[in-house]
């Protein structure tokens, strides 16, 4: 009596098993399951990956500004996005830290690590010092400058590679009531004090340095004094200039207010036509830990970090929504 042999799997069944295999979880070494995707056209070595020139959203999603107040904001006309690939190198940075000294920075609303209330100015001073000293340990050729902003702007500390020089000007600062925010004056001062590098080939030749402005800002929503001049257009379109923002807002939306903090946050984001800058918003009545975490995320080199909407700070995808328990700097 013949015993029938077990039938071998057909080619169609093998293909179904291959397609049914679950992809690997998304990790730092395998972002978005990159190794499980079909091999496509690869970007050239040392260039930004596909999609990193897209407009960045603010920390896992920018606020929805569809319900703006009755008064329209004078937002700069939308310029075409400049998608330029640059070498992903750790060249020296010239970091200009702009600290707001409005009276909102002195309100004791932030919750400190021990549960007591503190103000945004004290927290900002500490996180700026930690940022400068950590960046200096990463690369001692980085340079830093401190600018304070109230009704006007003042350049307190020139570009220096010694963190002690900047930190000596960082404390003993006083806040004041501010009626306006002269954003145009701030950028004009930056243009006077710095010079943007120029290379023969942006895609292949690393720049000698990059210029990055970090604005720590906390004011009620108000239309800044700003007009986009031709020199400013060139500055924002330069692939070696970055404008990062940490916006500390009141977190409330009263009906009688014509403008919302979301309008101001969207205005700041509209200045970045390249999609390479990072923008964060933190509630003034929230934990001080959030401010430290935002500043820690800005430690990455702007030429080496991804578009903000692609940035992930967890090992696995399931941890994306987990609450961070400590600031890492």
UniProtKB/Swiss-Prot annotation:
Protein localization: Cytoplasm; Nucleus
MF term (GO), any: identical protein binding
GO cellular component: BRCA1-A complex; BRISC complex; cytoplasm; cytosol; nuclear body; nucleus
Biased composition regions of type Acidic residues, renumbered to the chain: 10-19
Keyword Lipoprotein: no
GO terms, biological process: cell division; DNA repair-dependent chromatin remodeling; double-strand break repair; hematopoietic stem cell proliferation; mitotic G2 DNA damage checkpoint signaling; positive regulation of DNA repair; response to ionizing radiation
Region annotation VWFA-like: where it falls in the sequence: 95-298
Family: Belongs to the BABAM1 family.
Main function: Component of the BRCA1-A complex, a complex that specifically recognizes 'Lys-63'-linked ubiquitinated histones H2A and H2AX at DNA lesions sites, leading to target the BRCA1-BARD1 heterodimer to sites of DNA damage at double-strand breaks (DSBs). The BRCA1-A complex also possesses deubiquitinase activity that specifically removes 'Lys-63'-linked ubiquitin on histones H2A and H2AX. In the BRCA1-A complex, it is required for the complex integrity and its localization at DSBs.
This protein's name: BRISC and BRCA1-A complex member 1
Lineage: Eukaryota, Metazoa, Chordata, Craniata, Vertebrata
Gene transcribed to yield this protein: BABAM1
């Amino acid at each position: 009596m013949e015993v029938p042999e077990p039938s071998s799997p057909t080619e169609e069944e093998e293909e179904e098993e291959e397609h049914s295999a679950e992809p690997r979880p998304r990790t730092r070494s395998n972002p978005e399951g990159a190794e499980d995707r079909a091999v496509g056209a690869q970007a050239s070595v040392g260039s930004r990956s596909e999609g990193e020139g897209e407009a960045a959203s603010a920390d896992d999603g920018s606020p929805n500004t569809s319900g703006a107040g009755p008064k329209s904001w004078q937002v700069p006309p939308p310029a075409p996005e400049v998608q330029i690939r640059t070498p992903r190198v750790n060249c020296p940075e010239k970091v200009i830290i702009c600290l707001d000294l409005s009276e909102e920075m002195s309100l004791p609303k932030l919750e400190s690590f021990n549960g007591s209330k503190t103000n945004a100015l004290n927290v900002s001073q500490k996180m700026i010092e930690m940022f400068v000293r950590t960046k200096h340990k990463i690369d001692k050729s980085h340079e830093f400058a401190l600018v304070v902003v109230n009704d006007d702007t003042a350049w307190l500390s020139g570009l220096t590679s010694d963190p002690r020089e900047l930190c000596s000007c960082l404390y003993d600062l006083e806040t004041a009531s501010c009626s306006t925010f002269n954003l145009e004056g701030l950028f004009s001062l930056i243009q006077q004090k710095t010079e943007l590098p120029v290379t023969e080939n942006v895609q292949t030749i690393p720049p000698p340095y990059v210029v990055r402005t970090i604005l720590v800002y906390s004011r009620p929503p108000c239309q800044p004094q700003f007009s986009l001049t031709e020199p400013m257009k060139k500055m924002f379109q330069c692939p070696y200039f970055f404008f990062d923002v940490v916006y500390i807002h009141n977190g409330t939306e009263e009906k009688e207010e014509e403008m919302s903090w979301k309008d101001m946050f969207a205005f700041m984001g509209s200045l970045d036509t390249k999609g390479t800058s990072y923008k964060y918003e933190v509630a003034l009545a929230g934990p001080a830990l959030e401010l430290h975490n935002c500043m820690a995320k800005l430690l990455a080199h702007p030429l080496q970090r991804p578009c903000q909407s692609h940035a992930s700070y967890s090992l696995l995808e399931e941890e994306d929504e987990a609450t961070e328990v400590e600031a890492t700097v």
